[in-house]
């Protein structure tokens, strides 16, 4: 019985592996071509570039939104990598110094808390090229090999993008529309629940007074209820309204796009701004639905009709009955003109957000814009580094730790080479670099995986050498090894395959097999010792410290956001691009903090059963409580900030106002009621910002 039950699981795994193999075939074919072409013309010293560029191509193909200019800027770093590796290989102790500065700067500038391992292939490429150092006369050859790799990789990437886009497997615009559809569907469902909640409240009054009318035919079951006791429970309906569910859709989109955003030096492209702005509008609608649901007795039959009609519009787009954005915009415009609230505050709130949504829907030019301004992106990245390049920041501490440990491993390599003439000691810093992760527990787990994968890899390599002729050893091992790595079966499998490729580079037909295998094992052990000896004493990175820096980052974003809103109150409009950018990073920071808090839950459950950890468990509970408070306060602040931004949308201004050289004379179409509503929103923002600023920081661990 047990064996039979396991058959579907094994079958599913086999199917999954087959799909991974199918997806990996183009990469494998290109890798074999690139690696062996460079190997044939330039030798094994530069053929290692093929490995790096193939992994790079896999990442970039899966991020189709990156513009060519940003892609070219990214490729420029590979030229820097090749030059630094060449410079470091000219002299032994120069190698140690260059390694420290290169890895520190690459880690600091090419990764952050959201993409902590983004520097990996630039660092690994640098170290792999040091396996075979070149002399000064050979530098042009290496640069030529690098440029050839760049040209071939670019051709491959854009060919794959074209094929995947044509087959529908990869379409960034379709992916964006799917997120918008998901958010619209969520809003539609919540509007229906809100209308039903209003119908229940009206029915309660009407049952008491002897009336049974409802505003919408969909709620006749409420009118047909025999008595008030048979009506749906309002509290149950209120629980169905979940505004944070819409917020999480925007968070999910923000996290999905962050790889591309980072490679754009941290700026959103027009397409990303367009989609994220639509999701922000949905967030605002969800927040207003939630606010309205708190007082269901104030929902009139006319309000119910408003909500049901609006729900139909969003449902039509979500289900595909409305397929064009222009059609959605026209339908929404008709709705705004024909529907309204009697209550002034409700009218200004809902109309302000729906008008912002309408203006965004019509800005279709922005939805196709994949570019980011070069100068602005450089300025933004400098500002980001100025804010975060300090010893309190987790990634800065990790950059120092990584650079120090790998440089120490490089020094051990130099000393062993000089003292005992150990060949290929470069694998010590390579292994140290491979197993290091941001947090110590991740590093220890990676060390264990490396140890197991290395032992298995050594055993398999001994078999390969025994059965495969030496002339076929490199083509077979390199090809199969790369296939296993690119299929991403499991960490240990990837390390085993990597060991095969490493041993192939180390192994010489003239050397004894036992000597090669022993050298590989010894190098891994030495590298692991270098890492373990340092990670617990130098620049430790803890999740509690990361949470503290994220609190500070959220406060900084909030202050900058309210500065933009104050500017908007003074001049009648905000800088829409800047505010959307700030709201994007607010979503990223809060999502990152939620992920760290989930890890704290796991840690707490693990330590609660240990009597000696009671103090640590208490610290974790206090930390979680503080994080929850910060996230709750920041969510409320974000909702009011978004509302103010939409009310101060610069697109509300008349075209003639936009060309006026004196901004203080601009005339906006705002009514007195809307101005009062904006002032009230600003007061709420100031109050919530004060709560965030006066809240005590997270307590430090004892």
Language model features by range: what are they?
Residues 2-13, 22-65, 72-79, 96-142, ...:
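Pore- and pathway-forming membrane helices of multi-pass small-molecule/ion transporters and channels
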Residues 447-448, 492:
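Hydrophobic multi-pass inner-membrane translocation pores used for secretion
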Residues 42, 88, 92, 113, ...:
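Membrane-interfacial segments
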Residues 1-29, 141-411, 415, 419-422, ...:
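Cytosolic regulatory and coupling regions of membrane transport/channel systems
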Residues 175-176, 182, 472-493, 552-561:
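A compact, surface-exposed functional segment
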Residues 18-25, 41-48, 88-98, 342-349, ...:
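Hydrophobic alpha-helical transmembrane segments
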Residues 471, 484-485, 491-512, 671, ...:
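C-terminal functional regions that serve as terminal interaction/effector modules
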């Amino acid at each position: 019985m047990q064996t039979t039950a396991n058959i579907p699981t094994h079958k599913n795994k086999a199917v999954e592996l087959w799909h991974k193999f199918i997806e990996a075939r183009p990469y494998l074919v290109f890798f074999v071509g690139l690696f062996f072409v460079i190997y044939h013309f330039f030798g094994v010293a530069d053929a290692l570039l093929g490995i790096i560029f193939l992994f790079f191509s896999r990442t970039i193909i899966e991020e189709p939104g990156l513009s060519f200019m940003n892609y070219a800027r990214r490729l420029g770093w590979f030229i820097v990598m090749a030059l630094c590796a060449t410079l470091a290989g000219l002299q032994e102790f120069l190698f140690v110094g260059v390694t420290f500065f290169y890895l520190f700067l690459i880690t600091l500038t090419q990764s952050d808390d959201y993409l902590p391992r983004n520097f990996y292939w630039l660092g690994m490429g640098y170290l792999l090229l040091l396996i075979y150092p070149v002399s000064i006369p050979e530098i042009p050859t290496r640069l030529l090999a690098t440029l050839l790799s760049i040209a071939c990789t670019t051709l491959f990437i854009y060919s794959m993008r074209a094929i995947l886009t044509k087959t529908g497997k990869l379409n960034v615009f379709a992916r964006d529309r799917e997120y918008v559809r998901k958010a619209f569907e969520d809003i539609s469902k919540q509007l229906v629940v809100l209308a039903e909640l209003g119908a229940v409240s009206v029915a309660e009054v009407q049952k008491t007074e002897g009336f049974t009318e409802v505003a919408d035919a969909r709620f006749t079951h409420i009118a047909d209820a025999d008595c008030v006791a048979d009506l749906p429970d309002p509290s149950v309906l209120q629980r169905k309204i979940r505004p944070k569910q819409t917020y999480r859709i925007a968070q999910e989109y923000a996290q999905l796009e962050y790889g591309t955003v980072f490679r754009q030096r941290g700026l959103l492209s027009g397409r990303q701004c367009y989609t994220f702005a639509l999701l922000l509008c949905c967030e605002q609608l969800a927040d207003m639905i939630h606010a309205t649901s708190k007082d269901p007795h104030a929902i009139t039959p006319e309000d119910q009709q408003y909500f049901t009609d609006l729900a139909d519009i969003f449902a039509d787009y979500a289900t595909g009955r409305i397929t064009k954005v222009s059609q959605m915009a026209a339908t929404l415009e008709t709705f705004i003109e024909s529907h309204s609230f009697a209550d002034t505050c409700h009218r200004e709130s809902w109309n302000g957000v729906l008008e912002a949504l309408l203006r965004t829907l019509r800005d279709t030019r922005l939805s196709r814009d994949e570019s980011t301004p070069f100068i602005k992106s450089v300025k933004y990245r400098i500002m980001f580094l100025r804010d975060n390049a300090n010893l309190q920041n987790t990634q800065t501490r990790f950059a120092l730790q990584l650079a120090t440990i790998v440089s120490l491993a490089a020094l051990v390599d130099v000393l062993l080479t000089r003292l005992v003439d150990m060949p290929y000691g470069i694998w010590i810093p390579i292994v140290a670099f491979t197993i290091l992760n941001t947090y110590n527990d991740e590093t220890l787990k990676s060390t264990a995986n490396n140890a197991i994968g290395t032992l298995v890899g050594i055993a398999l390599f001994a078999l390969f050498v025994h059965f495969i002729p030496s002339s076929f050893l490199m083509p077979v091992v390199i090809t199969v090894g790369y296939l296993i790595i690119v299929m991403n079966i499991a960490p240990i499998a990837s390390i085993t395959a990597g060991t095969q490729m490493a041993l192939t580079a180390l192994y010489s037909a003239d050397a004894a097999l036992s000597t090669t295998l022993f050298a590989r094992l010894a190098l891994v052990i030495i590298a692991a010792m270098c890492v373990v000896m340092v990670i617990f004493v130098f620049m430790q990175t803890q999740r509690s410290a990361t949470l503290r820096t994220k609190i500070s980052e959220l406060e900084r974003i909030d202050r900058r956001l309210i500065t933009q809103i104050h500017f908007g109150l003074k001049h009648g409009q905000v800088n829409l691009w800047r505010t959307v950018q700030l709201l994007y990073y607010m979503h990223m920071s809060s999502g990152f903090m939620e992920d760290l808090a989930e890890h704290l839950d796991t840690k707490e459950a693990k330590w609660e059963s240990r009597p000696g950890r009671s103090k640590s468990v208490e610290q974790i509970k206090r930390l979680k409580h503080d994080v929850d408070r910060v996230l709750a306060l920041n969510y409320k602040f974000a909702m009011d900030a978004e509302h103010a931004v939409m009310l101060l949308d610069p697109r509300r201004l008349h075209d003639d106002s936009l060309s006026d050289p004196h901004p203080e004379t601009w005339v906006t179409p705002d009514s007195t009621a809307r101005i009062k509503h904006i002032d009230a929103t600003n007061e709420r923002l100031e109050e919530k910002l004060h709560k965030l600023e006066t809240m005590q920081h997270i307590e430090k661990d004892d």
